[in-house]
Amino acid sequence: MLLGSVPQLDRVAVQLGPFPVYWYGIIIGTGVLLGLWLATREGERLGIPKDTFVDLVLIAVPIAILFARMYYVIFEWEYYAQNPSQIINIRQGGLAIHGGLIGAVITGILFAKRRGVSFWKLADIAAPSILLGQAIGRWGNFMNQEAHGDEVTRQFLEGLHLPDFIINQMYIDGVYYHPTFLYESLWNFAGVILLLALRKVNLRRGELFFTYLIWYSIGRFFVEGLRTDSLMLGPLRIAQVMSIGLVVISIIFIIVRRKMGQADKRYSEN
């Protein structure tokens, strides 16, 4: 697709009759499938049946999407109160990661209790998969030309040595913008490598998941400061508040669980 003289990628991957299939959904789905593959592979190594994570994903993903949308709509209620028909329209974006994470954790706790397995063990195994899904998912925002930062010049983007297809896609309504989707995606990919390395350290059970929360939240806090479409509560950026809260809560949980003897098992123990 061309916008002026700048070639850009079409957010629609394929048109099936009257129904457009957006890259956003394809990319999110790809992230889920790759994350599932990673989790089932590690789960089998640690004695978790393959169908455990398949069943969990089939339940958790729809609930996470529901929570992600609810979270987004709540903080954009002024718009959706005037446009209620758009509340269920998620084909072009409008999913908040923090909302999805809340839904996934609640589902994971209930699922683990029903299956009679440790939630912390499942959470540790799933942590790199979740972050991988988030890293891939940000490219859906790229295709939608959303979740970007403030205005910049083309020269600034070229100075980052970015490929032309990224630079061109950051040209929106006559202006170039910070590719904050890329900053967060790269941070998340680095986090996946870190978490995979920490598996070999054999941390106490639950601490790999808390490391994920801390790592993601630190990156999200700084990237959010560059964005122009943040969900707001008065003067506060909701994602930054949530990020600070998750870091603090994670550190407290690590300390308290150790002191109370609730972190007695290691990552690889049955």
UniProtKB/Swiss-Prot annotation:
It is an enzyme of class 2 (transferase). Belongs to the Lgt family. The chain crosses the membrane at residues 19-39, 56-76, 92-112, 116-136, 178-198, 206-226, 236-256. GO terms for molecular function: phosphatidylglycerol-prolipoprotein diacylglyceryl transferase activity. Its EC number is 2.5.1.145. NCBIfam families: lgt (TIGR00544). This is Phosphatidylglycerol--prolipoprotein diacylglyceryl transferase. Pathway: Protein modification; lipoprotein biosynthesis (diacylglyceryl transfer). Its main location: membrane. It comes from the Bacteria. GO terms for cellular component: plasma membrane. Keywords: Cell membrane, Membrane, Transferase, Transmembrane, Transmembrane helix. One of its GO terms (biological process) is lipoprotein biosynthetic process. It comes from Bacillus cereus (strain ZK / E33L). Pfam families: LGT. Catalyzes the transfer of the diacylglyceryl group from phosphatidylglycerol to the sulfhydryl group of the N-terminal cysteine of a prolipoprotein, the first step in the formation of mature lipoproteins.
